[in-house]
Amino acid sequence: MPEVPWVEKYRPRRLSEIINQEDAISKVKAWIEAWLHGNPPKKKALLLAGPPGSGKTTTVYALAREYNFEVIELNASDERTYDKIARYVQAAYTMDILGKRRKIIFLDEADNIEPSGAPEIAKLIDRARNPIIMAANHYWEVPKEIRDRAELVEYKRLTQRDVINALVRILKREGITVPKEVLVEIAKRASGDLRAAINDLQTVVAGGYEDARYVLAYRDVEKTVFQALGLVFASDNAKRAKLAMMNLDMSPDEFLLWIDENIPHMYLKPEEMARAYEAISKADIYLGRAQRTGNYSLWRYAIDMMTAGVAVAGTKKRGFAKFYPPNTLKMLAESKEERSTRNSIIKKIMSEMHMSKLEAIETMKIIKTIFEKNLDLAAHFTVFLGLSEKEVEFLAGRENAGTIWGKALAIRRKLKKEEEKIRKERKEEEKVEVREEKPEEKVEEKREERETKKEKEKKEEKKAEKKGKQVTLFDFIKK
């Protein structure tokens, strides 16, 4: 019988057991008690917002247990269209007439609700007769119509100490001892995500090593993808296979492609091969959900399926195993390069021709036809848009790209010569202007000198006259 995940085994059953979220829990209790007292709050939906692993989902189920509610859960990532979501949310409009228990409609990952369905869901919230609780990692990504109708309760990121204390309690209940440095390392890697930390702890303990320090040392050894594949395909031990992703410098979705490529080369029987492919298909589902929701703690489940699930699928070939790189990676790399070149051309068209993106995309189609049919005009477009050799090849194809590029270089050289010629002519004109300006400046200076001299002479004459008058008056008084 497979071991129960510790995340579920040790999930808090009561609100008081939730770690370091006292303010949030207090608001949630006040809100739900308003419903129980027959006085529903003005905002009939509650939005729990905070980082992954902070206790949002746990709060909903602990609340339901304490206040005797039935939880109807749906996930916005899986049920995105309004028609699908509405079937569940419609339950909020009526009481559960046949049963005694009231309902809580729990909408997880509300930040993934499609905007097109948000207005109708908002209407259903307005007329709800049962409480609706939503959870989201990113508050501002929840559609505005829903944010406006929901009371916000913020969950804070757990500290490293909070995470370590929770792990210690689990180890005590399991009767297991793990060195403190191991717990510190796990808490650091979790970044406040308690769910991820508990999954990591269970993985470390399940490694089967008496000394957990060995597992940490194993993390520090850099492995190639071929060594990681060896752990998956050369072992029938699920616990050992799960170590394959430790410290591998590759994301799980990339490693999945390598495993997928090598399954046919490793398994002997079709039914065993089918079991291996079933395991990686489940892993792919978890990876897809992690990508859509940003809840990367789901990677743990994906890694378990793609490593341990594949390892125990059947009998592998014995002896030397040659591993093959996935063709998918090559195709994705090529298509990525093409997309990058295409986007670069579109940006240049938008900039040089002052177009919107949609107009630029349509214009690029016309330009591509020109590049295939009229090489001379294509060369002029190359210069005008400032296209690179790779971009010319994208538009014209390899066969014509060389010719167009050569013509474009010739045009650029010609333009450069013209620019130099114009630059020289302008310099000559500037020199002539300077020479013409100098004589005028000298004449102007002489004129100013003459005027200054005249003014001085006039001043001196006035002084002399004044002096003459003063002498005459003095002489007159003396007489």
Curated annotation (Swiss-Prot):
Described purpose of this protein according to its UniProt entry: Part of the RFC clamp loader complex which loads the PCNA sliding clamp onto DNA. The complex possesses DNA-independent ATPase activity.
> Which residues hold ATP?
G50, P51, P52, G53, S54, G55, K56, T57
Q: Which GO terms describe its molecular function?
A: ATP binding; ATP hydrolysis activity; DNA clamp loader activity
Q: What is the lineage of its organism?
A: Archaea, Methanobacteriati, Methanobacteriota, Thermococci, Thermococcales
This chain's protein is named: Replication factor C large subunit
Among the GO biological process terms of this entry, one is: DNA replication
Note the Pfam families from the entry.
AAA, RCF1-5-like_lid
**Which keywords belong to this entry?**
ATP-binding, DNA replication, Nucleotide-binding
Subunit architecture? Heterohexamer composed of four small subunits (RfcS) and two large subunits (RfcL).
Q: Which cysteines are joined by disulfide bonds?
A: none
Q: Which family does it belong to?
A: Belongs to the activator 1 small subunits family. RfcL subfamily.
* Sequence ranges of Basic and acidic residues compositional bias: 420-468
Where is the segment annotated Disordered? 420-479
